[in-house]
């Protein structure tokens, strides 16, 4: 569903943000 896609995008964005924080 569209909700699932939005949730997936949010989770991916949070994961990427976490990786960026660790990289810093």
UniProtKB/Swiss-Prot annotation:
- Spell out where the chain crosses the membrane: none
Keyword Hydrolase in the entry? The reply is no
Q: Which keywords accompany this UniProt record?
A: ATP-binding, Chaperone, Cytoplasm, Isomerase, Nucleotide-binding, Stress response
> Which Enzyme Commission number(s) are listed?
5.6.1.7
- Chemical reaction(s) catalysed: ATP + H2O + a folded polypeptide = ADP + phosphate + an unfolded polypeptide
> Where, per UniProt, does this protein localize?
Cytoplasm
- State the GO CC annotations: cytoplasm
Gene Ontology molecular function, alphabetical: ATP binding; isomerase activity
Q: What is its main location?
A: cytoplasm
Q: Does the keyword Heme apply?
A: no
The recorded induction information for this protein reads: By heat shock and ethanol.
Query: What is this enzyme's class at the first EC digit?
Result: isomerase
Main function: Together with its co-chaperonin GroES, plays an essential role in assisting protein folding. The GroEL-GroES system forms a nano-cage that allows encapsulation of the non-native substrate proteins and provides a physical environment optimized to promote and accelerate protein folding.
Family, according to the entry, reads as follows: Belongs to the chaperonin (HSP60) family.
> Oligomeric state and partners?
Forms a cylinder of 14 subunits composed of two heptameric rings stacked back-to-back. Interacts with the co-chaperonin GroES.
* Name of the protein: Chaperonin GroEL
Q: Which gene encodes it?
A: groEL
């Amino acid at each position: 569903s569209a909700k699932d896609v939005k949730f997936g995008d949010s989770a991916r964005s949070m994961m990427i943000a976490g990786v960026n924080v660790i990289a810093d």
